[in-house]
Amino acid sequence: MILLAALLVLSVIAGAAAAYNYSKWNTLFQPGAGSLPGNLAEESADLAERAAEEGIVLLKNQENTLPLTHLQINLLGAASDRPFYGGADRDGFSCVSPEEALKEENFLINRELSGFYEKNRIAPAGTAEGQTDFGNYEIPQADYPDGLLDSARDYADIACLVFGRRDAAGSHYPADMEAWTGGDAGRHYLQLTQNEEDLLEAACSRFGTVIVILNTPVPMEADFLSDDRIDAALWIGEPGGQGFRALAAILAGRVSPEGKLPDTWVRDMDCLPGQVSSVPEGDEGQDRTFDACTEGIYSGYRYFETRFPDAGADDPDGLEAYAQSVAFPFGYGLSYTSFERKITNVLNGGDTIHVTVHVTNTGSVQGRDTAQIYVRAPYKEGSPEKPDVRLAGFGKTALLQPGEEEELEITLPLEDLLTWDSAGTVSGQAAWVLEKGSYGILLMEDAHTVTDKKTLKIAEDLVFDDSGRGPKTGQRQAAAPVFDTMTESLAGVTASRADWQAFAEAGPVEWQMPPAVEDPPASAGRLSVKPADNGLRLADLQDREADDPAWPALADQLSASDYRRLLVRQGDCSEAAASVGLPFLLEARLQGGIRNDTAGRTGTLFPSASLLAATRDRALIASVGGRIGSEAAALRAGLVRIPYAGVRRSPLAPSSMVFSEDPLLSADMTVELLQGIQGAGICTCLTGFGQQSGISGSGHSVFLVGEQAARELYLRPFEKAAAAGCVDIICTGPDLLGDTPAWQYSSLMTDLLRGEWGFEGPAAADLLLADPAGTAAGLEAGTDLFYADRAKIDLLTADSAGADDKAVLLQEASIRVH
């Protein structure tokens, strides 16, 4: 019954019952006091600090400014006083402040300056319920007391400026900040404000050493960092509760930075291809945000590395154009030491390519290095679109002392290298393909800088269809098109590397916004629910197979009120259903750390997903997942909802909580995190399926995306998690794919998710911030469980379907989630 969709007390994946029996859930996850034991909290804090140490990225370090040798420093900027830790601004989480962390490393902080920020905090402006505050609270230079900064220079000649940006929590970042506190007309949220520019100029004109700390989960517009007066810069993401301890250790030199950027940092957001067809909410008289993915697969580094290749006879201005656009490439990150890397072997193992990389620490201090392997696939005009390079694998060394060496074995599954051939140019029909030809196996410092390369030949085309290799590993059916309508809508305007000029001249997509879903007519009728007395309890069925007739017999015992409780979730808990012996159970949401607002419980605040991805450390991410699972158990929650899957199309897009702009990195991090959580005996729910954001929106956003981009980029983390069997619930949201809400899109929720991928778990829709009208359409499309305001949704109204038809839909949904 849907009770299993809601709670996964006995989740059935691929027809086999999960490892947790009813008695465990009934005794462990009961309401009441839930808190972290002291040893668990300490271990989690240590792991959170380690994750931040590995993730922080050194962007700039002129003349080896860092690590610092002088202990007296000045902290400047409002974000040095009120930084963004994550977790919706640390609410309920324990956090160590920048000043506290620096003092622990024996730094001496200018208290006169710090006291000024504490006493002159600008009060946040009020926002509507559910709205994110994007105000910028930097203090104008006119409000600084005369002589304060000159006095600070006398205290120490080192200025450490902190500029902060928060996560967007499922929203687009403001494209114009005029309406927000501290904002400027014509500037977007990820630009420096005038007040911040003035502070930076004041610091650069006074202090001999200027260090910039960027406290943001997504890239900011970074052209200002090219100023030679800025000596060093670090990106710290939203570092979590212990992250400033990690930053202090790096500034002091106790830890060498080792993070690698999970996104491309550009000089000007206007150069991003994903911005071309975006209409911010309210623009041009529209009441919805519309994003047309005309760039296709060419987002992030895939665009810049393909659009602006190294200068040559065919593109003499390539290098200059690239440098004018990209400040820091995907995968970039400096260290206090240096490494020599080379490929020593490439072996074609059939379904997997094995690459051996030899790494030597050639510097004077200890450190860890990440070997990044990219693939350059053969391409000719008329073949399926492919980026010039794509990340194919990565590996990380142990802590290497100066002169120490290590060999890394990096595996590249062929299925991670496939291309979606929408036009069927390889096999005559749309399919996943790997074209024959010479493939460059590239060892790179980042997505732009090649260190070593080898060549691998693929002798014949590999086609994953019914007449070729069949479905991909772990899937039920060979892939077939499911987004034809959207693909056709973008025909002729989607970017092709064969003709960049045509893409540049195409302009925004014309799109007619669909009408809002109307409420069902009063005459639609209502279902009559007569619960049976079959004498069954959930505990009786814990070892039954998914197709056992006892499951529908159990479902028949549900009353109308049971349906409302179990199919519609209002918050972070489920209500008990005595008719089938289901207890009250808690869920937790992962937002930096786990939290359950219903019970008022929080765990440890870990770094933001993007900073976790910057670690490139699979084992570490699995450990973080395990710790999150252990904390969920200690807080008596049996399910964790995770918004980190997905791919960041643009820094300004509503995807600030996902891991990366790269699908392989996002997918691998997602799988490791989920496997860690499951290993602690906790169920997992991935949110944001078929959405731009992992956090549910209001249903006012429209995403128009073609088949190739959807499959190769935005759905890839969900696909890989489903194939690995580490996700128990897959949850979509209210925003539209083309003209259809994702939760009512049968091609997504049934054809792809269940038919092709073979996913047996519950499919859910988070509609808490949206109008949930159209339940029958959602059920018919394959959605089983609804997170929604119960007062706004009535499952017993027939909607557009007749009462009998909807009763069948409910019964089918209940059987699916068993």
What are these regions (language model features)?
Residues 1-449, 466-818:
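Glycoside hydrolase catalytic-domain context in secreted enzymes
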Residues 450-454:
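Extracellular and select intracellular beta-sandwich modules with Ser/Thr-enriched
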Residues 455-465:
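Short beta-strand edge segments in extracellular beta-sheet folds
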